[in-house]
Regions:
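Structural motif
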Residues: 29-40
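Short, acidic Ser/Thr/Gly-rich low-complexity loop/linker segments typical of extracellular
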Residues: 50-65
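A short, solvent-exposed loop/turn motif at the edges and junctions
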Residues: 47-53, 75-91
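Conserved C-terminal beta-signal and adjacent last beta-strands/turns
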Residues: 735-756, 766-870
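Membrane-proximal, glycine/serine-rich, low-complexity loop/turn segments characteristic
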Residues: 22-23, 63-67, 87, 94-98, ...
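Outer-membrane beta-barrel translocator domains and adjoining extracellular loop/strand segments
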Residues: 211-212, 276-282, 351-368, 401, ...
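Face-selective signature of the C-terminal outer-membrane beta-barrel domain
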Residues: 330-348, 377-415, 419-564, 587, ...
Length: 870
């Protein structure tokens, strides 16, 4: 009996072994055809060809992968891939093949003649959620590429984001503020296929404890990632090289966004003209205003800067060698507490060549100067910070310790009217700490804030002329502190608060110069300024129905202690400054609101201009200060209207601002031999400014695109003393821009942008008017030849008026092609400045000057590169 049992057991084991041996595992990855992003939740059925009978089934994971085991012979069977909102796909199976990847396409579901699609914008209260997939295209790489296509969102050349004309006050990733004020690091480096939605938090109050107490008119953005991009390492790698001249580009990003920790690290290097240092720019201004400011910056007494271009894309002229590295980390150390660190370094080396003609308009003559310059700049920046933040409904605490170090070197060879060579060394060092504490108990809130900073600018300038050498040294340093405490009460619908503060400044400046003619005046300075400012700032807010009103009446008392250490002379003074302001907003409906604001202010005294000796700012400009405690008086009034229909992808706003100022000091400019002496003249002058503009953006659902129109106008009336004569002038600037992005066909994307501007200056005392008109156009066309093969043709056209009868035309064209393999590797070939255009020219106006400038462009570049997103 036992023998029979053994035989039976052995037979069953053999059958099981054969069965296991015949088991086959089918694997693969399912992606969206348009964006190559992985699809989760796709049902994968194994079935017989021509039959509805399902043999096996499974679902794809978060990364789009699937596994399906079967012992059924593969021949004669097929895999069926299905997901709501996507076209069902079928693959026939072959013996010996176990890897089956699939690309799926989106498909609308028609139910009783109603097409069901995910909306491109959803609204939940004050939050607008933009569905990234509705705006993205296979040609888009970074999140910034997609943001530019979203109605209501504006992205400037620097990367600054505005929503319906208002700048952001916060930028979050999954609800956490890892990057502080440098959100370019996220928008330019996070791949758009990793992002599910962009949430715009309108009227965002970043301090939770003040959520129902103090209103905010500023928006914030929160990035919501796809599940497949969370809690794992994702990133991109790009490398390329080319010729004419030898060019390279390399980039690597690595990031991970988990529930309790986030990291975003980047490494970039190129010489193709792309300014990757913009990633590190501070884009959110949270330093306050007027004498309540939490910041203080030293003046650059030496100011040697190569000519900068207007209008044209910066990457057309940047002849660079740039390297950057950033390391950004955040850890959740408590339920509502985060610890974040940031380390940034950049090296940017630029060379440039330009020529210019400057006309200085005087009451009785015009002075012309010609410059031909070849410049080389080297800029090294190192920034580091560590921040601890707690944000709850009862407690807000943050402390950020930062350091910002810069080493800026400039060398300029100048030919023309005044040939010379300038060598400037302008390092800058700053260490600062920001502490904020808010405690809320019931209907009241207590705060204590403190900002402290030490900074130093030891600058030098060497000017070599045919007739001699000049050297200027200017060293300034300062300690600045602003601490305040406040108590606020919330008595619905009112909130009243009182802030008390103390500002301390201790600053010194020492300068020496050699080689400057004695006839021009004293060329040495050694001064010190100290002040202790106490201030009180009562504020009241009202919010009820559609009304929001804010009234503020800050008052400060400041004793100043100024000493000229060269002559051991003191000039002390005390001053009271009152700066009332009002803000009013009325929400007519969920779509339409009006805002009105006004202020009367006494501007901050320009105490960094308190010196008597001359300082050589550049090869031609000599600056001298003026010890005067009179402050500029100002008034402003601003009115704006906002309109939006988020579900119809329509956003619009209109604004108008009027401002007036009165000063007892007038800027003075004197021409003496080879120099321009810039100073101040004790004479009361008035100036005023008009600013107005409008913006509108509308999504084009049928064409899967957007159209936007914006226009701005500014008019300034002022005066300037030149050679002891007062000159009145008016400058005007008007521009209008239209942008269109459309997909007329599935395989075609088109972008077009046109800008027209008019700039003019009127010299009232001699009745002379000069103006210039400029037109710029940008166009790009993306053609998907196949699902993986892309062609792109783009161009820029500029028509700039150089004089009354002379216009400069410039056409720049680019061509690129790329091919993306199944696993996401992309090979591309780019040709920039296809026709190898040489120069760009334009005319501009400022401070009774007309400047005609011509700049050398980058030559034709041919670059081959490989890109991979993981």
């Amino acid at each position: 009996m036992r023998t029979h049992q053994r035989y039976i057991t052995l037979t069953l084991l053999c059958i099981l072994a054969l069965q296991l041996h015949a088991q086959i595992t089918l694997t693969g990855v399912v992606r969206l055809q348009r964006t190559r992003q992985p699809l989760s939740g796709v049902i994968v059925n194994l079935k017989q060809e021509g039959s509805k009978r399902i043999l096996k089934f499974t679902r794809t994971q978060a990364d789009g992968s699937y596994k399906l085991q079967t012992s059924t012979p593969l021949a004669g069977n097929e895999l069926q891939f299905s997901l709501i909102g996507y076209a069902t796909e079928i693959l026939s199976l072959s013996e010996g093949q176990t890897q089956y990847d699939m690309m799926m396409t989106e498909k609308s579901i028609e139910l009783r003649e109603v097409i069901v699609k995910a909306p491109s914008i959803r609204q939940r209260g004050d939050t607008l959620a933009y569905n990234v997939a509705s705006f993205a295209d296979i040609n888009d790489k970074s999140l910034a590429d997609v943001l530019k296509k979203m109605p209501g969102i504006e992205v400037s050349e620097s990367g600054e984001i505005k929503h319906n004309g208002k700048p952001l006050n916060k930028f979050y990733i999954e609800g956490r503020d890892m990057l502080g004020n440098r959100y370019n690091l996220a928008t330019t480096n996070i791949h758009q296929t990793d992002v599910a939605s962009v949430e715009v938090l309108q009227n965002h109050q970043p301090i939770k404890a003040l959520d129902d107490m103090s209103f905010s008119e500023s928006p914030a953005i929160n990035i919501r990632l796809k599940e497949a991009a969370k809690s794992r390492l994702v990133g991109t790698i790009k490398a390329g090289g080319g010729i004419s001249p030898n060019v390279w580009e390399s980039e690597a990003t690595l990031m991970r966004f988990a529930k309790k920790a986030q990291l975003l690290n980047t490494l970039k290097s190129n010489n193709i003209g792309t300014d990757v240092t913009r990633d590190n720019m501070v884009l959110i201004d949270d330093i306050g205003s007027s004498f309540l400011s939490r910041n203080y910056a030293l003046k650059n007494y030496i100011n040697v800067i190569p000519d900068r271009l207007m209008d044209i894309s910066e990457n057309r002229v940047r002849k660079n060698q740039t390297h950057t590295i950033s390391m950004n980390n955040l850890w959740g150390v408590g339920k509502n507490t985060d610890l974040s660190t940031q380390l940034l370094y950049s090296h940017d080396r630029l060379v440039s060549a330009s020529c210019s003609q400057t006309s200085y308009f005087l009451n009785d003559s015009t002075i012309l100067t010609n410059e031909n310059q070849k410049a080389k700049t080297r800029q090294n920046k190192l920034s580091a910070s560590i921040a601890l933040n707690t944000n709850t409904s009862r407690l807000y605490f943050t402390n950020t310790l930062s350091t910002d170090l810069q080493w800026n070197d400039t060398d300029i060879d100048m030919a023309g009217t005044y040939p010379n060579r300038q060598t400037a060394r302008q390092p800058s060092y700053k260490v600062h700490d920001k502490f904020e504490l808010l405690r809320r108990t019931g209907k009241q809130a207590f705060t204590f804030n403190s900002y402290n900073a030490y900074m130093s600018n030891p600058h030098t300038l060497l000017v070599q002329r045919p007739d001699g050498t000049q050297q200027q040294n200017a060293r300034s340093q300062a300690f600045f502190s602003n601490s305040s405490t406040s108590l606020g009460y919330y008595l619905k619908p009112f909130m009243v608060s009182m802030k008390l503060g103390l500002v301390v400044l201790s600053r010194s400046m020492k300068s020496t110069a050699d080689g400057i003619p004695d006839s021009l005046g004293l060329v040495h300075n050694h001064v010190g300024m100290t002040y202790l400012r106490t201030y009180v700032s009562p504020k009241a807010e009202f919010k009820s129905g559609g009304w929001q009103v804010r009234l503020a009446l800050p008052v400060s008392y400041t004793p100043y202690f100024f000493k000229d250490k060269l002559v051991q002379a003191s000039n002390n003074h005390h001053k009271v400054i009152v700066s009332p302001s009002v803000y009013l907003q009325y929400q007519f409906s969920s779509k339409f609101k009006m805002s009105l604001s006004g202020s009367i202010s006494q501007n901050e005294i320009r105490e960094q201009n308190f010196y008597n000796g001359l300082i050589l700012s550049d090869y031609r400009n000599l600056n001298t200060g003026f010890v005067n405690y009179d402050s500029e008086q100002g008034k402003s009034l601003s009115l704006s209207f906002d309109y939006k229909q988020p579900l119809n992808t329509l956003f619009a706003n209109v604004y108008i601002t009027r401002s007036w100022s009165e000063s007892t000091l007038t800027t003075s400019r004197r021409f003496i031999d080879d120099y321009i002496l810039n100073s101040y003249f004790a004479r009361k002058t008035h100036s005023n400014t008009w600013m107005t503009g409008a913006r509108m953006s509308k999504g084009l659902n049928l064409l899967r695109g957007m159209i936007s129109v914006s226009t701005d106008y500014m008019s300034f009336n002022g005066a300037l003393v030149q050679n002891d004569n007062l000159s009145h002038y008016q400058s005007n600037l008007w521009s209008i821009t239209t942008k269109v992005n459309i997909h007329p066909l599935k395989w075609l994307e088109m972008n077009y942008e046109i800008t027209y501007s008019n700039e003019s200056m009127t010299f009232k005392d001699i009745d002379i008017r000069s103006s210039s008109n400029n037109l710029s156009q940008r166009f790009s066309c993306n053609l998907n030849i196949t699902k993986a093969w892309l062609l792109k043709l783009s161009g820029e056209h500029y028509s700039n008026q150089l004089s009354d009868n002379t216009h400069k035309q410039l056409l720049l064209t680019d061509f690129s092609t790329s091919y993306t393999f199944v696993h996401g590797v992309e090979l591309s070939l780019n040709v920039r400045n296809l026709f190898n255009q040489k120069t760009y020219a334009y005319t501009s106006y400022t401070d009774l000057m007309q400047i005609r400038q011509e700049y050398e462009l980058r030559p034709r570049n041919i670059l081959a590169s490989v890109f991979f997103h993981f």
